[in-house]
C-alpha cells in the first residue's frame, strides 16, 4: 500500500513540475489555480477588411454593436490572447495555458464588432463553441468551423457562408446568403429561415430545416440520419428525394407529386427552384 501511495506521489510531482515548466515564469497553473485573467485588444474597424479568429479550446462569441472599433476580450483561467494586424487582416489567437485542458474553467473570447462592418469574418475553434449574433450584420465572406463544439449564427447576411462542424450541433436562424456550404460530420443540424443557394452535407446526425422562403436551389446529401423539411405554402419548387434505406413521406401540398416508399418527386408552382435530397440511411419527412 505504501509503495502504491509513494508511486502516486512521484507521478503527481512529475506532472506538477511539468505543468510549471510548461507555463514558464507564470508559475503554477497546472490545475487552474492562478488568478482570474482577462486581456483586451482594440482595432480601428476602418483599417480592417478581414477578422481571422483561431481558438483552441475556448468559446468564441461574436457580437454586433453600434460602435466604431473592434474590441476583443478574453476571460477565464489560464487563457491568453495574441493579436496582430497585417495587410488589413486582424488576427486573434486565443488559447488556454496549462497542462491538461479538462481542469480549466469555462473560458470565452468575446469579439464586439461594429454593426456597419461589411467585410470578411473567419472563426476556427478546436473544442469550443462558436456563437455569432449578427444583429443585422451584412458581411462578405463568413467561415465558421468547430472541431468539437456547437456552431450557432443568427440574424446575419453574408454573400458567401461556409459552416463546418465535426462533432457538435449546427444551428442557423434568420440567415440570408447568396450561397452557403453547410457540413457536419457528427451532430444535428437545424436551419430556420435561411435563404440562398444552399448545399448541405451531413455524415451522421439529423437535419431539421424550416423555410419561410425558398429563393434558390437546395441540395441535401446525408449518409446516416433523418431529414425533416418544412416548406412555405407559396414555394416555387421542383423536388426530388431518394433514400437507399429508409422511408420518404410528405404532407406538403404539391401541385404535382409522385411518392413511393423510397422516392419522391414533386412540383409546386412553376418549379423554379430545385431541391435535391439524397439519403443513404434514414427517413425523410416533408411538410
Regions found by a protein language model. Give the residues of each.
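Short, surface-exposed interaction patches in beta-rich subdomains
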Residues: 154-155, 161, 170-287
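Hydrophobic membrane-insertion alpha-helices, especially the h-region
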Residues: 7-23
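Sec-dependent signal peptide cleavage junction
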Residues: 20-38
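A short, Trp-centered hydrophobic/proline-enriched beta-strand micro-motif
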Residues: 52-54
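Short aromatic-acidic-glycine turn motif
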Residues: 73, 79-82, 246-251
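Right-handed parallel beta-helix
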Residues: 33-50, 59-63, 67, 78-164, ...
